[in-house]
């Protein structure tokens, strides 16, 4: 949470030898709102590249089901934001159980509003294969060409893939 610029560079040098400067450039371009040095260490490069790969492969299947990509960007206010948007944070929102998990979500009004949106998207997707509903911006199916991605946050937005260069750098593909 309180990592210095120097400790972040040391971590990145060990994790991505010879790629630190490009990593920082691409990460800041993809995530300009990340202000703390530690934010640059917390970018998901463990699960995200695989998710993008799967979305690209599955969306290319002729006659296959549409693919809907999302990122859960909402930041937990608990412990002065220590949790940020940890892996699996969206589960309580998808099942609309944020009050039961208030120790992680804070159980705020804003969190409840987002939980209602995320839950309905999951329900719609389970019922129809399409997560769209009137509480969200139009969410096009993902393709490798449009890279349409829903960003779940207090204000939900659809954007193209912002971290493509970073993923290519990290994976070497």
Per-segment meaning from a language model:
Residues 1-109:
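Substrate-gating cap/lid region and adjacent catalytic-acid/histidine neighborhood
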Residues 34, 46, 57-67, 75-78, ...:
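Alpha/beta-hydrolase-fold serine-hydrolase catalytic core, especially in secreted/extracellular enzymes
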């Amino acid at each position: 949470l309180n990592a210095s610029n120097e400790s972040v560079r040391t971590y990145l040098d060990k994790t991505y030898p010879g790629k630190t400067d490009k990593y920082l450039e691409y990460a800041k371009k993809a995530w300009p709102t990340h202000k703390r040095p530690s934010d640059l260490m917390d970018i998901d490069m463990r699960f995200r590249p695989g998710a993008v790969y799967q979305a690209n492969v599955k969306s290319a299947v002729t006659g296959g089901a549409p693919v809907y990509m999302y990122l859960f960007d909402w930041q937990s206010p608990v412990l002065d934001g220590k949790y940020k948007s940890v892996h699996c944070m969206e589960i309580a929102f998808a099942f609309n159980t944020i009050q039961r998990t208030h120790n992680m979500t804070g159980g705020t009004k804003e969190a409840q509003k987002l939980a209602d949106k995320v839950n309905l998207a999951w329900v719609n997707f389970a019922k129809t294969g399409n997560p769209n509903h009137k509480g969200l911006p139009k969410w096009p199916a993902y393709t490798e060409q449009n890279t349409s991605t829903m960003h779940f946050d207090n204000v939900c937005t659809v954007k193209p893939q912002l971290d493509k260069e970073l993923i290519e750098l990290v994976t070497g593909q």
